[in-house]
Each structure stands twice: as structure tokens, then as C-alpha cells.
């Protein structure tokens, strides 16, 4: 093991420093990485115990956001970090996705990668640095990790691509994507865009890959100093005699018949029955003790799945036929409905084959904005999308708990896709919440969410610029051929080589996500996949526009009503009143809710009755208006003194009508008026101290 080492290099205007052997020395692998003023610590460890009975790599990636990294104390009653925030979960997924395919297929030991954010500057988000740190930590460790990866964030500002754009540059960028990959190819993409073209997207990915190569060269330079002995993983196989008998019993034509059943559940059932039939026959012929039988059974099941996978891929490549009978470029049948729920503010049902999303839109008042408080961001969020994937959508039985990482990730992608067409606050002051309930799933449910969400937004009368549609693309590759699949279903996602999701409008791409199970994809394949995805997106958009072509002109009668008014920020105190007295009285009298921006003076009034909302607005206008000489009021007498009447013109505004200004009533005013009477007065003077002098207005 090497002692403490440090490496530094300039990249993209920032200094990148890696330290090894100083901290977390008991971890199998640890990398301290500083990029700019952002610092992350990645640690990688593996259990010595093999987990029995699992058919996947048990990898866990944790991303810890420490508030001290940004010089902040966590909000709330308990002043310490709790469960991972949504942003931390998304960052963990961002790191997980490019590294997961690089573990041996048969690794069955628990692997835990923890990326801890220790310091952060606003211009160098630590999530992408975490990909670089994770790759180093895994390569420093004894864990059998088979590759070197790195990632970059790329923007598109004023016609120029920018690697690791600053926070200010991202505000004006048409593009915000994270790209990860190896030296040879791109393996992961995640991000959003403002209707960029396919050509611009490919160009961005190629620029990003050139930057990734530079980072990987630095990694290679570091790792050349290491000669770590890696843990050996033995590839488990069924016994030779069992494999031989399995090959004899398996009839390819029988397997083919079952693979080409169009309906997902029936296909799954028939494949399961055939698998169990074969394995049962084998165990009838061979004596195997109970302890070994469980392992051999699992290995035979894996062997069957591998045979089915190879046959499905062979049929697609050689015959151009997919499991449900479609051609590679064919989309599943689509139906769209809007207004399916009578009491919601907007709703839509989008069905594509055996994938179905129910989209629901709820409109809320400005005070219902989501508060955002992370180490990278503070503020509020007006456009929110939540994605729910209940177990019944795939015919399973599972406990209902909170959203998992997958649900959070899918919802975030769909939100980014739709956010590009969402109206500005000035045009539509509502908080908008979109919920996607996945009622049925056979692949591409996140893209179905984009479609149902777009339809529901128009149904709700939200003035989105245009429809957004999404489609998931797949890839099947062998030594000589590559076939891009349009609108993949679950089986093709599971057994294919790529999951490539593209969402956008007729004008361009608004969200993009790609994950590869192979070494990666090159420029020509990206061009082909994006071109094919655009053709599919146009078809889907045509169907959506046939269903509802523009946002409804009026909101649902059950939606809240909002009216805005801007007042002088100096008048905010008067509107609130001492102890909130004035604003509370308005809320109670007109049955509304009010939010005030004390910096801009913007006042939002929210209620269910249009008349009451309008009345409240008029009342606020009157209350906060500048009083000028000549203005007339019907005011209430609050006090009577020998020298005149004190009259409340509006809450908090009182003037004095001197006895000499009361006309014919100047001598007998104390007998004629009493406290609480309403009198019509006119403003005759306002002195330098702001005191208002009144006179009796002529009847």
C-alpha cells in the first residue's frame, strides 16, 4: 500500500486535487477529491460474506450532503442531517448509474460506496466530482471493479458549449446535462434542455466526451502508481451434467413460441412455467442434496434466462421482430383522454400498450410553494411533479411505503421535461403540482408520465407553450449488427443494451437520459437513436394534439382563484398592521388567503369566490393607496374632542376634522355626532409630518 500521495492538475479553469492515504485509511479504498472549492470523500468497501439466493450485484451508493459544507445549519427542530434529501438521492443515482455496469456480473458480496460532501462552492457541484472520486476509490480498493469512468456537466451559453458552467452561466444556458463515460465511449447521460435540436445534443455529447477523456487520462496517470490485488470472483455454473441435460431438454422452438406472446403477463407466465418444467425434469433425473439443490436451481434459472435473452436478441437482429410482434421502429398503440376525474383541476389518462399513466394537476396559491433548502440551493419551487409506482401496476404484492429512489428519479426526469414549457410566474401565478399515478407498466413509464402530465396541464388550463412527449429507445448489439428499438417494453429494457429516454416538443429536446449496459455508444449510434426518437416523438405529439390542442381557456370551477397586486414596499407594514391585525381582518372578512413579498411589494390574494377575491383586492388598493389633498372618504369617527373629530379613513389611517372645517356643524358637532358614526370627509391638507387634516364634504 502506498503512503500519502497527492496529485494536482488544472481542468476547465479549476484546480483538481486528489489525495490518497491521508484519511479513511481503514476503508478498502478512499479518495479525497477537491475541485475548485468543492471537496468530496469517496469510500468503497466490500463484505467478505457472499449473499446466497440473489441474482444481482448488491451495490449500494450513498451520497451524504453535509450542511456544514456550505456553511449552513440544517433547518427544522432537529439541527442535524437526517435521511437523504431528494437532491442527495438524485446525486446518488447519478453516481450509481455509470459505475454499476462495471462490476463482475456474478459479484454477490455487499458493496457500499459512500460519497460525502465536505465542502461546496456554488460553481462546482459536487455530484459530478463524486463520479470521478467514486471511480478512484473503487480502483484503489480490492473490490473487483472493471473500468475507469469520469463525468462532466456541460452547458450551452450564447452558442458555445461550456464544460462545468458556473451557476450564473447555467441561468442563461440552453442545456444542463451530466455526461459520464469511459475513454472509449459515453455510458450515461442525464439532464434537461430548452428545446435543443438533435444535432446540438449530439455535438454537446461529443464535446463532453472529449473532456471526459482528459479526466480519465489523469485517473490513469494516478492509477499507474498502484498495483492493487483485487478480490477474485468465481463465476458460478451449474454442474456439467445438469447443463448437458438442460441443453437436451430445451427446445428452441418452444422457447420462441413463449417469447413471442404479445401480452406481458401471459408471456411471463408461460416462460416461468416452461422454466420450472425443465428444471423439475432435471431434478427428477439427478440426485442432489437439499443444500446444493437451491444453488443449482438458481443457476439453472439464470441459464434459462440467458438462453431466452439470447434468442430474443437473435430474433430482433435477424428477423426484425420484437416480442409483441412490432418492428424495431414501431410504437405501441396509444390512447389519450382528458378530463377523466370530475373534481380535480386537470386530469388525463395516457395509455401506450401495457403502460398507463394517470396524470393529475392541482393548482395552488403562492404560499404553497415547495421550500428548497439544500447545500447547493435555497429558495422555493413553483412547478412540482411526483411519480408514483404502486405494486399493482405490475401485478405484484408489496407494502406501500414512501417513494423509493427509482420513483424520485423518474419523477425528476419527467419534471425536467415539462418544466421547459411551464409558464412564468408573471403569466400564471399558481403553484402547479403534477402527479403521475402509474396504473399499469410494461416499460417506459417515466415517458408516459411526461405525456399524461402535458395533457393534464392543458386540461387544467395551465398556459404551457406546447405539448411535450417522451419515448424510451433501446438497443440490441452483436458482433456485426446494431438495432435501435423505438418505445421499448420491459423485456427489451431488461435484456437490451441501452435505455435511452428522450422527451421534447416539436421544436426540440427538453429532457434526456441514457444508461448503457455495454462499453458505451459512439457518435453515429447516438445520431441514429436521436433521429429515430424524434420520428417517434412527432407521432406521439400528433395523437396528443388531436386529444387537446391547446390549454383550456378557463380553469376548473374547483380550482382556487388568484389575483395579484403590487403595492409600494414601504406600505407592506400598513397592510399587515400591528401584530398582523389588518391583514387578519381582511382574511376573515373576505374569506381569502394572502401572501406578501415584502421586498417587491407583490401581494397575492387566493380564494374560492371570485367576488370576494376582487373585493379583497379593491380593499387592499384602497388601504395602501397614497392619500392626496382633495381625496374624499366615508370614514368612521373614532374619537370626539372639543376641537374636532378624529376620523378613520382606512385601517391605520386617521385624520382630524377640525371643528372649523365642519361647516354648519362646527358649533353643534359634539351633540350631532357620536363615536362609530360614518361621516363623509375630504382631505384638505397633509403636513410635513404626514398628519391628515380633513373637512366635511358637501352633501
Curated annotation (Swiss-Prot):
GO terms for biological process: mRNA catabolic process; RNA processing. SMART domains: KH, S1. Pfam families: KH_1 (PF00013), PNPase (PF03726), RNase_PH (PF01138), RNase_PH_C (PF03725), S1 (PF00575). Keywords: Cytoplasm, Magnesium, Metal-binding, Nucleotidyltransferase, RNA-binding, Transferase. Mg(2+) binds at residues 493, 499. Its EC number is 2.7.7.8. Residues 560-620 form the KH domain. It catalyses: RNA(n+1) + phosphate = RNA(n) + a ribonucleoside 5'-diphosphate. PANTHER family: POLYRIBONUCLEOTIDE NUCLEOTIDYLTRANSFERASE, POLYRIBONUCLEOTIDE NUCLEOTIDYLTRANSFERASE 1, MITOCHONDRIAL. HAMAP family: PNPase. This is Polyribonucleotide nucleotidyltransferase. The lineage of its organism: Bacteria, Thermotogati, Thermotogota, Thermotogae, Thermotogales. The gene is pnp.
Amino acid at each position: 500500500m502506498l503512503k500519502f500521495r497527492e496529485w494536482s492538475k488544472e481542468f476547465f479553469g479549476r484546480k483538481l486535487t486528489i489525495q490518497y492515504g491521508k484519511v479513511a485509511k481503514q476503508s478498502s479504498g478512499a479518495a479525497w477529491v477537491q475541485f475548485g472549492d468543492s471537496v468530496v470523500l469517496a469510500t468503497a468497501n466490500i463484505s467478505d460474506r457472499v449473499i446466497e439466493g440473489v441474482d444481482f450485484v448488491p451495490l449500494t451508493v450513498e451520497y451524504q450532503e453535509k450542511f456544514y459544507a456550505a456553511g449552513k445549519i440544517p433547518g427544522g427542530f432537529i439541527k442535524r442531517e437526517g435521511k437523504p434529501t431528494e437532491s442527495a438521492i438524485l446525486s446518488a443515482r447519478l453516481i450509481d448509474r455509470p459505475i454499476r455496469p462495471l462490476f463482475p456480473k456474478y459479484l454477490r458480496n455487499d458493496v457500499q460506496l459512500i460519497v460525502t460532501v465536505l465542502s461546496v462552492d456554488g460553481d462546482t457541484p459536487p455530484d459530478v466530482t463524486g463520479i470521478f472520486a467514486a471511480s478512484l476509490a473503487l480502483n484503489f480498493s480490492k473490490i473487483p471493479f472493471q473500468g475507469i469512468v469520469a463525468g462532466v456537466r456541460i452547458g450551452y451559453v450564447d452558442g458555445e458549449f461550456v464544460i462545468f458552467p458556473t451557476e450564473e452561466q447555467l441561468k442563461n444556458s440552453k442545456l444542463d446535462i451530466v455526461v459520464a463515460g469511459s475513454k472509449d465511449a459515453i455510458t450515461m447521460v442525464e439532464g434537461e434542455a430548452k428545446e435543443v435540436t438533435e444535432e446540438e445534443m449530439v455535438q454537446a455529447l461529443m464535446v463532453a466526451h472529449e473532456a471526459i477523456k482528459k479526466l480519465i487520462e489523469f485517473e490513469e496517470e494516478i492509477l499507474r502508481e498502484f498495483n492493487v490485488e483485487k478480490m477474485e470472483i468465481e463465476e458460478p455454473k451449474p454442474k456439467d451434467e445438469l447443463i448437458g441435460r438442460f441443453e437436451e431438454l430445451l427446445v428452441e422452438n418452444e422457447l420462441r413460441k413463449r417469447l413471442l406472446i404479445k401480452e406481458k403477463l401471459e408471456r411471463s407466465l408461460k416462460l416461468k412455467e416452461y422454466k420450472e418444467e425443465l428444471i423439475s425434469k432435471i431434478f427428477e433425473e439427478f440426485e442432489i442434496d437439499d443444500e446444493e439443490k437451491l444453488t443449482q436451481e438458481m443457476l439453472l434459472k439464470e441459464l434459462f434466462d440467458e438462453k431466452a435473452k439470447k434468442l430474443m436478441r437473435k430474433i430482433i437482429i435477424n428477423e426484425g421482430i420484437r416480442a409483441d410482434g412490432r418492428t424495431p421502429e414501431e410504437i405501441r398503440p396509444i390512447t389519450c383522454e382528458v378530463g377523466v376525474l370530475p373534481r380535480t383541476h386537470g386530469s388525463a389518462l395516457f395509455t401506450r400498450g401495457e403502460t398507463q399513466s394517470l396524470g393529475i394537476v392541482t393548482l395552488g396559491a403562492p404560499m404553497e410553494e415547495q421550500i428548497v433548502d439544500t447545500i447547493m440551493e435555497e429558495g422555493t419551487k413553483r412547478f412540482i411533479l411526483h411519480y408514483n409506482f404502486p405494486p399493482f401496476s405490475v401485478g405484484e404484492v408489496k407494502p406501500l411505503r414512501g417513494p423509493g429512489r427509482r420513483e424520485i428519479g423518474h419523477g425528476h426526469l419527467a419534471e425536467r421535461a415539462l418544466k421547459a414549457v411551464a409558464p412564468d410566474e408573471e403569466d400564471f401565478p399558481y403553484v402547479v403540482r403534477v402527479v403521475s399515478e402509474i396504473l399499469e407498466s410494461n416499460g417506459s413509464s417515466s415517458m408516459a408520465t411526461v405525456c399524461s402530465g402535458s395533457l393534464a396541464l392543458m386540461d387544467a388550463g395551465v398556459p404551457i407553450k406546447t405539448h411535450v412527449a417522451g419515448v424510451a429507445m433501446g438497443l440490441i448489439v452483436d458482433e456485426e449488427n446494431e438495432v435501435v428499438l423505438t418505445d421499448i417494453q420491459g423485456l427489451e429494457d431488461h435484456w437490451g443494451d441501452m435505455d435511452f429516454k428522450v422527451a421534447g416538443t416539436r421544436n426540440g429536446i427538453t429532457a434526456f437520459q441514457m444508461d448503457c449496459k455495454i462499453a458505451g455508444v459512439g457518435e453515429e449510434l447516438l445520431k441514429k437513436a436521436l433521429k429515430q426518437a424524434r420520428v417517434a416523438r412527432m407521432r406521439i405529439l400528433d395523437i396528443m394534439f388531436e386529444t387537446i390542442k391547446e390549454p383550456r381557456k378557463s380553469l376548473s370551477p374547483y380550482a382556487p382563484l388568484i389575483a395579484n397586486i403590487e403595492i409600494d414596499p414601504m406600505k407592506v407594514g400598513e397592510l399587515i398592521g400591528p401584530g398582523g391585525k389588518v391583514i387578519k381582518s381582511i382574511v376573515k372578512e373576505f374569506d381569502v388567503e394572502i401572501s406578501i413579498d415584502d421586498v417587491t411589494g407583490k401581494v397575492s390574494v387566493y380564494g374560492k369566490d371570485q367576488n370576494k377575491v376582487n373585493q379583497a383586492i379593491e380593499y387592499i388598493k384602497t388601504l395602501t393607496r397614497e392619500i392626496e389633498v382633495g381625496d374624499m372618504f366615508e370614514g368612521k369617527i373614532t374619537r370626539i374632542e372639543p376641537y374636532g373629530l378624529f376620523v378613520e379613513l382606512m385601517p391605520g389611517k386617521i385624520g382630524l376634522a377640525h371643528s372649523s372645517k365642519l361647516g354648519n356643524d362646527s358649533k353643534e358637532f359634539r351633540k350631532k355626532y357620536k363615536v362609530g358614526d360614518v361621516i363623509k370627509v375630504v382631505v384638505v391638507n397633509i403636513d410635513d409630518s404626514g398628519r391628515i387634516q380633513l373637512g366635511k364634504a358637501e352633501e
